[in-house]
């Protein structure tokens, strides 16, 4: 018996919506990364993008445990000498709700062309509304 290998044109992708209200950042991110990659499917193939589309609503109401609200730091660099910027989780959630979740999920996906294709299937919205009703997403509880 041969091992099954999924073909890119044969992959069936579903749409799921997750309500992130009062959910912990890391727990949501790890499950989302798993589903974007397609590891929950029996036809998972490492070199083919078999994952589903994930819509996350209420990302502004995401939480972290302990003192990570003030202690967790995010860094970015402008490219110029001395151009490093630092911000906390709390400030990032106020200014860009959902970006912390996007960064967490992106860090859990493979690096390279396949990982970049996977992260494009993640849609994050700060509020409860999203423009993907036409895709009829199923509710996913984490």
UniProtKB/Swiss-Prot annotation:
Top-level taxon in the UniProt lineage: Bacteria
Any one GO BP annotation for this protein: translation
Keyword terms of this UniProt record: Ribonucleoprotein, Ribosomal protein
InterPro entries referenced in this protein's UniProt entry, alphabetically: Ribosomal_uL13 (IPR005822), Ribosomal_uL13_bac-type (IPR005823), Ribosomal_uL13_sf (IPR036899)
Gene Ontology, cellular component aspect: cytosolic large ribosomal subunit
Gene Ontology MF terms: mRNA binding; structural constituent of ribosome
Pfam families, A to Z: Ribosomal_L13 (PF00572)
SUPFAM superfamilies: Ribosomal protein L13
Family (UniProt): Belongs to the universal ribosomal protein uL13 family.
Primary role: This protein is one of the early assembly proteins of the 50S ribosomal subunit, although it is not seen to bind rRNA by itself. It is important during the early stages of 50S assembly.
Xref: NCBIfam families: rplM_bact
Subunit structure: Part of the 50S ribosomal subunit.
Protein's name according to its UniProt entry: Large ribosomal subunit protein uL13
Organism: Cupriavidus necator (strain ATCC 17699 / DSM 428 / KCTC 22496 / NCIMB 10442 / H16 / Stanier 337) (Ralstonia eutropha)
């Amino acid at each position: 018996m041969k091992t099954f290998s999924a073909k890119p044109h044969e992959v069936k992708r579903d749409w799921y919506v997750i309500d992130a209200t009062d959910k912990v950042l890391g727990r949501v991110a790890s499950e989302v990364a798993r589903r974007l990659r397609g590891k929950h499917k029996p036809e998972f193939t490492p070199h083919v993008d078999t994952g589903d589309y994930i819509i996350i609503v209420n990302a502004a109401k995401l939480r972290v445990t302990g003192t990570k609200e003030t202690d967790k730091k995010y860094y970015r660099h402008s490219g110029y000498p001395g151009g490093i910027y630092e911000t906390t989780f709390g400030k990032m959630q106020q200014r860009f709700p959902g970006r912390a979740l996007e960064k967490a999920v992106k860090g859990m996906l493979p690096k390279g062309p396949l990982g970049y294709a996977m992260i494009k299937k993640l849609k994050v919205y700060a509020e409860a509304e999203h423009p993907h009703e036409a895709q009829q997403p199923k509710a996913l509880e984490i």
